[in-house]
Amino acid sequence: MRVRLLILMLFLSLAAIAQNESNGLLYGKVVDEQNMPVDLANVAVSELSIGVTTDSRGRYELSLPVDTTLTLNFTFVGFQSEQRKVRLSKGEKRKLDVVLKSNATTLPDAVISDRAIDASSLTRLNAKQATLLPSIGGGIENLVKTLPGVISNNELSSQYTVRGGNFDENLIYVNGVEIYRPFLVGSGQQEGLSFVNSRLVNNIEFSAGGFAAEYGDKMSSVLDVTYKKPRETAASLTLSLLGAEVHAEGVLGKDKFSYLVGGRYKNTAIALNVMDTKGSYRPNFTDVQALFHYKINDRLDCSLLGYYSKNQYYLAPESSSADAGFVNSVFRLDVFFEGQEVDDYATGLGALTFDYKPNEHLDLKFITSAYSAYETETYDIFGEYYLGQVETSLGSEQQGNVISNMGTGAYLKHARNAFYVQVYNFDHKGMRVQDRNVLKWGLRYQRQNVDDVVNEWNMIDSAGYSLPHSMDQVGVMPALLPDLSLDMFHRAHNVLGINNVDGFVQQSLTFPLHDESEIVVTAGLRANYWGYNKKMYASPRVGVAYKPNLEGQDLVFRLSGGVYHQTPFYREIRNRDGSLFKDAKAQRSYQVILGGDYKFRAWDRPFILTSEAYYKYLAHVIPYDVDNVRIRYYADQRAKGYAMGLDFKINGEFVKGIDSWASLSFMRNREDVEGDYYLVDSEGKKLPFYHHSDAAVADTIPLGWHYRPSNQLVSFSLFFQDYIPNAPTWKVNMTLTFGTGMPVNDNESDFYVPFKTYPPYRRVDIGFVKQLINEGSSFSKGNPLNYVKNMFLSVEVFNLLNISNTVSYTWVKDIYNTSWGINSYLTPRYVNVKLVTEF
């Protein structure tokens, strides 16, 4: 494995070094109408699907192929896009400066406040990079997963954890509307399509912590996505073995009305059919969303966002076989199934936004949104398993075969779960800009309606085959002996309505210093009233950014922190048996983040080194455990904890003219649950908390601190792009991910007793892209290909190194009552073909 990885990295390094320097060089500066530099503006080449971002002084550089007419697009949020055509000669260096004009519907001064945010903890991502990214779960989320502090050990899911949190601690906004994650989904293969459609995206901002008061009440991260406002007619069509995507956009009525529509279909059967569990898979995931924008007058705009998705997952398992153990002690679990699982998830969202600008300094938004989801989970799965020891001796005739029986048994899993939720939001947000100082405020009323039906149980049938089983007892009928037991039984029906109110006020002040250095201070207060327990929570937050004026050095230092309350949505207040915990409270953390950006040049190319150190004191959290992507909370338990770590990211032109980046993170994440303990007998022997033996319990000993389920000591990710010199229509996109193992519990241990550690997660996905048509292509008159702007053919190899990554464990007992965790693996290597057409 190490040799393969070293060879791969050596190949990529040589490819980057071997770039042909005979290309032409285009450089210049991007400024606004006041001749102020626009930093982090996107400079993209349409024909090559490559691009760079400007530095803090608005400068950019691009190495371009010669003797080819290329189209450059200059874009930045809040500005009108600019387009230029260039044609360079061999060895030519040409300067091209561009002035971006403010949107008519955007306050000119508001752009300054947006750049001040860049000096804080928000990271911008280029949505175009997600279009050709090799991914199964989702384009935008896969880009987020490559950032420092972000952890995802499941390529089938779009979910991720950030700096020791869990899936429920991440905020996602689309055009200012909060998006919610599915409730009943238990595994990545059931999840389907994420909300964000990368084809519709204009701007992406992400923060891994320390975000300002304007963002909501979650403890880990915020992903803020803004959809495009079209200015011309365009469309795209994507076809692949995993599904299809289509989108259309345009303007009508002298630019007063614009539309943006996208639809997606996803079928992951080719990925699921190569997994360990064999059977009939029928996953069908579909969604459609649209954004309509109407300019009522010069001061008032109106937009409507609509979304509907239908995700269906059907599985009729037949058999499964998996090995576990060590080199000289290997065990095999064979399972034969009957039954089926049928899951259905329907989600809808509508949001109406009015944006009123009474003058050049004031911006008022009013957003009304309604979210609805109906999810059902039904299954009856009967499994008969056989656990055996595998012969590992070299040269043995039985090598690789099962040579002894260690246990047999059967189980039956049953569920009839249904979850229905409605969320209504009435939201006002305001912003006043005066010079370079920005005042923001907001107020929201929210109504949550939940109807939750829980009916699930597991039955284990030892039937005298798997031990221990009840011994014969004099005077007791065999039918009364507990050979048949419900290992788990949950039944409940909860109907709940909650009224919530939250708001914030936030001030950003910019202080220019005498030496042309700059300090930006952002301070705010967020308040939240949670109707479930009728309590108010206050969350003060502050951030400071300092940009010194150093000759030849481009540095920004940041310090941010504050209080972060997270009121439970619903999942956190539901006990494992389905009942609701009445005395629930909001989770609370105190965070401090110290970081900085250093922009420099190496090999005559621009780079940015970002580093952050953070400490999060978890003053009040709810313990939980994770199985695949399903989180089960211990709602009636309380814990304190901490997360601390270091994050690093190097972003720049590893290959001249194309952005790539690498992220490295170190983290320690622990907690101490109130009242947790373990048992010891009279001989001092430790007993499990689920103690059922006849040995007398002599004492209880506090357990103390332990690792949280999301603890991952080291994680590394790489997003790499390359192209062939003098043939830039051939391109490579690659993502590499490594993460050390995280804690896992067996099926009987309590949450605070980590049973073992998952193996490290290691994965490489690579896509080979050929651009078949670009805007410079010409065809005969009447040829329908004249309507095609760009066409790409991509061959994607998922899990290039064919590494078996563990997503969960199947726990069984042998004849000696020892629990064995048999690995459940994620997808092996397989190939996908994708055709992308842009009109």
Listing of model-derived features with the role each one plays in the protein:
Residues 29-36, 41-46, 73-79, 89-137, ...:
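Short, acidic, small-residue-rich periplasmic hinge/interaction motif at the N-terminus
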Residues 49-59:
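Short, acidic Ser/Thr/Gly-rich low-complexity loop/linker segments typical of extracellular
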Residues 80, 90, 116-211, 222, ...:
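Periplasmic N-terminal accessory/gating domains of Gram-negative outer-membrane beta-barrel systems
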Residues 242-265, 278-317, 341-372, 441:
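Transmembrane beta-barrel wall of Gram-negative outer-membrane proteins
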Residues 318-319, 323, 548-593, 613-638, ...:
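Surface-exposed extracellular loop regions of Gram-negative outer-membrane beta-barrel proteins
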Residues 365-369, 586-653, 793:
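Membrane-embedded beta-barrel scaffold of Gram-negative outer-membrane proteins
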Residues 511-515, 615-617, 637-743, 836-838:
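Gram-negative outer-membrane beta-barrel transporters
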Residues 660, 737-747, 770-839:
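C-terminal beta-signal and adjacent terminal beta-strands/loops
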